[in-house]
UniProtKB/Swiss-Prot annotation:
Keyword Transferase included in the entry's annotation: yes
Task performed by this protein: Specifically methylates the adenine in position 37 of tRNA(1)(Val) (anticodon cmo5UAC).
Catalysed reaction equations from the record: adenosine(37) in tRNA1(Val) + S-adenosyl-L-methionine = N(6)-methyladenosine(37) in tRNA1(Val) + S-adenosyl-L-homocysteine + H(+)
Protein name as catalogued: tRNA1(Val) (adenine(37)-N6)-methyltransferase
Entry-linked CDD domains: AdoMet_MTases
Record SUPFAM superfamilies: S-adenosyl-L-methionine-dependent methyltransferases (SSF53335)
Main location: cytoplasm
One GO location term (cellular component): cytoplasm
Protein family membership: Belongs to the methyltransferase superfamily. tRNA (adenine-N(6)-)-methyltransferase family.
GO biological process, one term: tRNA processing
Superkingdom per UniProt: Bacteria
Methyltransferase in keyword set: yes
Any coiled-coil regions, as ranges: none
Length: 239
């Protein structure tokens, strides 16, 4: 008896839509924040590691009109959804998609920017949907191996941007510094003024640099905060 295939809820943004397909990877606030926060210049070659349904790649395509974006994922249902989302966007000529593990991926060039919403569950707990388990279990792509591979794939002036829960993010940053990376940007994110920091947005550089630190509160007493609205207004329909 075949298991029931669960459709993942889609999401409509101002300039593109996300079809979830059977990916098990719904649009998340983490992903939207990272895609809106990442620093690039228009001509950059960008690599999106673990693209899922293609959200980060599409956000970068919208924000940086001349950027060439390469997206990878190891999960075939994610690739199928991302392929549809890329084809339906106005930037399909600047988006390339590869069904590949980044550890085995051999591009023809290095990248100026890498963007990644990495797996972070270390507890071994299993998801009800195997695709989401693949997307989120650290043993699929160990953070140390991810950092090493990012270092190899970046140009000397390149940077890599990530979003993680605070505990995993602090551990990831510590590991990166031990491996010779430099922390160029760090944003601490709170759900609201009364709740503690729960996410870190951060950018790692290969070259020595000062760290630019900022703070973001998502919700105010009246809804989304002004800072969150300013960050994401190019994307969310009701901003």
């Amino acid at each position: 008896m075949k298991s029931e295939r669960i459709q993942t809820k889609g999401f409509k943004f101002k300039q593109f839509s996300i079809h979830g397909g059977e990916s098990g990877m719904p649009v998340s606030t983490d992903g939207v924040m990272l895609g809106a926060w990442v620093n690039c210049i228009p001509q950059n070659k960008i690599l999106d590691i673990g693209t899922g349904t293609g959200l980060l790649a599409l956000m970068c395509a919208q924000r940086f009109p001349s950027a060439q974006i390469t997206a990878l994922d190891i999960e075939i249902t994610a690739i199928e959804a991302a392929k549809q989302n890329f084809a339906q966007s106005t930037w399909s000529d600047r988006l390339s998609l590869h069904h590949s593990d980044v550890l085995q991926f051999e591009p023809e060039h290095r990248f100026e920017r890498i963007i990644c919403n990495p797996p972070y569950f270390n507890s071994g707990e299993q998801s009800k949907q195997s695709q989401r388990a693949t997307a989120r279990h650290t043993d699929t792509l160990q953070h140390s191996a991810l950092l090493n591979r990012c270092h190899e794939l970046l140009t000397n002036e390149g940077t890599a941007s990530f979003v993680l829960p605070i505990t995993e993010g602090e551990q990831f940053i510590t590991m990166a510094l031990q491996q010779g990376w430099h922390l160029s940007r760090l944003c601490r994110v709170q759900p609201s003024q009364k709740k503690p920091v729960h996410r870190l947005l951060f950018e790692l550089a290969k070259q020595a640099c000062d760290t630019q630190e900022t703070h973001l509160i998502i919700h105010s007493s009246e809804g989304y905060s002004d800072d969150f609205t300013q960050l994401t207004r190019e994307f969310y329909l009701k901003m």
